[in-house]
Amino acid sequence: MSTIIPSPLAPQPPQQHYVTPPLTVILTVILLVFFFIGFFTLYFCKCFLDTMVQAWRLHHGGDTVSDNPLQQPEAPPVNPGLELRIINSFPTFPYSSVKDLREEKYGLECAICLLEFDGDHVLRLLTTCYHVFHQECIDLWFESHRTCPVCRRDLDPPPPPENTKPTVDEMIIDVIQETSDDEEDDHHRQQTTTQIDTWPSSGQTSSIKKEQNLPEKFSRSHSTGHSIVRNKPEEEDKYTLRLPEHVKIKVTRGHSQTESCVTFAELIRNRGYDHRRFGEVSGQTQSKN
């Protein structure tokens, strides 16, 4: 009896197991997608609305006014310096053109930088007080100041009164007053010369000596922050340019290699100010002539 050997069974193919993702992961992805879609939708809508509102305001021609009533428009900054046309009214010239014409022979220096003037330096003369400075120094000073650095004289005159023009009688009175002032000055100089020529008595001599022994000192705030003590006339005048009258008139009228075409006195007169208070000597010189 024969035995039947069963044939081996064929191997079954491996079964593929599909694992479904958990529900939480699916919900997270869906929420992120909706979040980004909503965010970008709102962002683009806002940009579109802002563009439309701005275009509408520009189309209707008007500056955008703030909806906040408490927000006031900012006032324009006030310029603390001097006007450019007033600065240009002061003449500029090289120091070499007036160096040999000065009445004094001691050196001049700029009160701002404290440097002595050289021949190639360009100077600017303040015709109100005849203090002279380097053009760069004084122009930089006038950007934030309206006064002379030495004597502190205000170079920005007050606004003229409205609808007031000097009459002919007032002009005649001004001319007569200037002439009388000149005569009084000449008379005062003559009296002073007579008193100097007269020899004082012993009591007067002692009093004069006491007065001469008193030092003439005074402090003043300097432009660089320190104080100056003046004792000698040379120290008092080292910032002042003293010239002969014909040279002074030529410089103040802007004919000696200057950039300005209008003098300070003409500028003040055109604007309706009383230029006699600013120490301009050109009008007095013409009245003497």
Swiss-Prot record:
Primary localisation category: membrane
Pathway(s) where this gene product acts: Protein modification; protein ubiquitination
GO biological process: protein ubiquitination
Region called Disordered, residue ranges: 179-237
Record's compositionally biased regions (Polar residues): 191-207
Recorded GO CC terms: membrane
Keyword Amino-acid biosynthesis belongs to the record: no
Residue spans, zinc finger RING-type: 110-152
PROSITE patterns for this protein: ZF_RING_2
Superkingdom field: Eukaryota
InterPro entries: RING-H2_zinc_finger (IPR053238), Znf_RING (IPR001841), Znf_RING/FYVE/PHD (IPR013083)
Catalytic activity: S-ubiquitinyl-[E2 ubiquitin-conjugating enzyme]-L-cysteine + [acceptor protein]-L-lysine = [E2 ubiquitin-conjugating enzyme]-L-cysteine + N(6)-ubiquitinyl-[acceptor protein]-L-lysine
EC number: 2.3.2.27
Written domain comment of the UniProt record: The RING-type zinc finger domain mediates binding to an E2 ubiquitin-conjugating enzyme.
Protein name: RING-H2 finger protein ATL29
